[in-house]
Amino acid sequence: MAVDTFFVGALKGVGKVYLQTVLDCYSRHAWGRLYTSKLPITSVHVLNEAVLPFFEAHEAQVYTILSDKGREFCGRPDHHPYELFLQLEGIEHRTTKVRRPQSNGFIERLHRTLLDEHFRIKGRRTWYESVEQMQTDLDSYLEHYNTQRHIRAG
């Protein structure tokens, strides 16, 4: 499992928008949630609300998560919300080497795909006024990505 934070852009009247992405490197199933900050609690939220329930529904378990050393993922293990959450869930946390984004290449490629196939296209056609509107469109794209795109790609 790979996780990362991606800066999507800025919405007028809202501010900066970040995408918390999670990718199962084996199945290539992806999850994404948009937030106006990149805090540890948002990283926990996407795991707790979307990823772990998906695995539980499929009677599977997440054993390891790979992230960069961003402040939203790393800190003192006894105080950092993300680190504490992973400990409580029994998930091992591995980090990439500094300045080596290719170490987390699966998620970097997902970001490129999301940018090319979703954000750039929708951004030209749709005037978003809220993160919720953006999330609705992202959810539709991720549904396509997870169910249709890989069937054709093989």
Language-model features: locations:
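Charged DNA-binding/catalytic regions of mobile-element recombinases
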Residues: M1-G154
